[in-house]
Amino acid sequence: MSNQNQSTVFTPSSSTLWGRLGGGSFLPDVLAILFFVAVSVVYFIVPIRDGLVLTGHDHTGGVGSGVEMEQYRATHNGERTRWTNTLFCGMPTYQMSPSYRSTETLSTLERVYQLGLPGLSAYAAYVFMMLLGFYIMLRAFDFRVWMAALGAVLWAFSSYYFIIIQAGHIWKLLTLSFIPPTIGGMVLCYRGKYMLGIVVTGFFTAMQVLSNHVQMSFYFLFVIGLMSLAFLIDAIRKKAFARWIKATLSFAIGGILGVCINVSNLYHTWEYSKESMRSKSELTQKTKDPADQTSSGLERSYITMWSYGIGETWTLLVPNTKGGASQLLADNKTAMKHAKSDFAPIYRAFTQYWGEQPGTSGPVYVGAFVLMLFWLSFFIVKGPMKWCLLAATALSILLSWGKNFMGFTDFFLDYVPMYDKFRTVASILVIAEFTIPLLAMMALKKVVEDPDCLRGKEDGLPRVHYITVSFALTGGMALLFWLMPDLFFGNYISSSDQMYMQQYVSAGYIPQEMAGQIMDNMSEMRRAMFTADALRSFIVVAIGTALLLAYRSGKLKSTPMVAGIIVLCLVDMWGINKRYLNDGMFTRPKSNEQAFPQTDADRIICQDTDTYYRVLNLSVSTFNDNTTSYYHKSIGGYHPAKLRRYQELIEEHLQGEMSRINSAVIESAGHLEDCPGDSLFPVLNMLNTKYVILPLKDNGKLPVQNPWAQGNGWFVSGIEYVPDADAEIAALHTADLRHEAVVDDDFADVLGSEALQSDSTATVELTSYEANRLAYKVKSQKGGVVVLSEIYYPGWTCTIDGEPTDIARANYVLRAIKVPAGEHEVVMTFDPQTVHITEAIAYTALALLALMLIGLLAYSLYRKKHSL
């Protein structure tokens, strides 16, 4: 091959996709895209034909928590509220409905990019976008059409992506689908297509950020940084440093434009993060282990709860290395062939999975032959890009081990900015799922373009040994797993299995003398699952290697070889993915009313004519459920990044009070007025908890009214100022919250230090309610401090008779204002000015990107016209 073909930095020829912008046929690319459409549709053909849908927890929860936002938008000409009161007594919607008018154009372009597939099947559209994104990147790398199509299949059909579709993690998947074409824009910049690179980078960065999964975008900054380093090393070797600077600036401009188009979302996500669970607590006397705390984020144990096991990493080659998913063991046909009939019913109490994670929806499997090609790249792909991609692969695997490799993880938690903001470290394996197929395709590209790379000798050794070693590291290991599984893995029993078995024995469900026999049989069943998959992976690698050897010997041309590999890998990965996303998981679509059936308890509570109150639902997992939010303003809810102070209030006060109010309902036969409510559950009262829903037998639910709820607001006769958060949250245990307010010293200037006078005639009445605007009529003879049962958050503004006034934080989480004597209208509004400022920036960036695209198209047409 020529030096130009080996170069990392070059100007694409007119034979590439990008070269054709100046002329040439796009037909091969169109055919590849049609192939992607066909593959995506066929995978979901049964759900498409029958009109079936998935019902993921995240989706259902999103509907429940988002109902107030949708109602607001429908009644306010498409305007969006940035606040909702449906869960956790109120929180911003920045991480629930992060859509802004400036991104509506992007949403339209996304629908165009999807070729209308969502109208047929949203799930097919997701897979199509994964395929198309990687294809665009490989075409930017100058891969031929069908080679790029193969690479797209290798990336898009990695098992994890189908698993997250099933789980409903759609934002994550969309973000991942836009990452490869963003990197494609970077490649174009470094290959001399500066303006096109800026436009491609800008557009796909904007789409990626719009998809709103910061964790995935953050992880791929490691990849982008290492790839940029590879281009730098190549430029230094070729004495083209100035060109590297120009390319880097071009890529940066594109990235900045894409980020600026989404600046509204990004800024408010950052602003919210400072108040969320993802930020450092102000409490210093927490009972949690100080060594478990990170400098500015979540607890280490929480971040690393889902850590990939070191041995579990073999799932990249053999998917059932640790049993696959946390599905019932009794549902696995291979396992049940080895089950003893006496124990068969017991296996409905255990799962197939025996790994270190608390549970999993499935393994990360990149394809057995893909992994073989990845190892082949180690020997035949030259240049710094290979080493940087290998480094990224190793980094992702080491970090995915989390608590199983804690020294390395601690270093990143302590010294890498933002790394401690994200949990589920196992998900960083998405980097390996990107680099492995990319390096595999670089190896195959080398084989196709330079067949001699596998012939003859290098440094005195036959090059065919590159295939031999790569086969040994994949097919050979799979064969060993099949022949001698116990040499690598012990008894196929997890610590969770042992714990559950001990519980069953202690409860008398399983005799002690049978426990060991059951465990032995379970090991045999799981061993059978593992060895069956090991043999399967060996066969896949063997077939793929045979295709390579046939091409090397001249018995097979490159086109049929590539076609054979496409079929092999598609069949292999398709079969694995169908384990975790199959037709049986789809159901008939339900309306929201069917998904959230209104219970008798809901109907009774909804008959209340009060404008605004809150409901505590004890019949569900209160703080892991959003169904209550569909009909009520809930004390609970579900969100992975709730407000930090509210989470601390849950831990310090609400959990205990929930138990006490439950007992009080039982002891008083539902007559809570007969119990000392202000001493038993004062914090629930200050949150205006007017109703409690309790579980009954046969899934029934009982609504109980709480007469101790303090309403929407009240005057207090005293303020207890405290020096810090520790004292503030502790004082809620002893303060008379009906008549006193606990306030941090920082707000003394807002509420004043003069003595307050009691006024039995003072009233606070809510006169108007909207999610982001609350109006009150406040009457008093003496004036004073009013505490409102609303969650304090920066960005809320308040006026008294139209004049602005400051808001203080009281009782750890609530709002308080100082009101003069007389009758006044108090209005609370959440319309942050930062939204308007960031929207102006976003529109400017969008206009600049559009102008660049228009200029690029005009230049291409001009060049085409004058080349005729």
Q: Where in the sequence are the language-model features?
A:
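Contiguous transmembrane helix-bundle modules in multi-pass membrane proteins
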Residues: 168-179, 189-206, 214-216, 220-255, ...
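Active-site-proximal, structured, solvent-exposed surfaces of multi-pass membrane proteins
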Residues: 67, 372, 636, 690, ...
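Membrane-interface coil-to-helix junctions
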Residues: 39-134, 141, 153-176, 294-366, ...
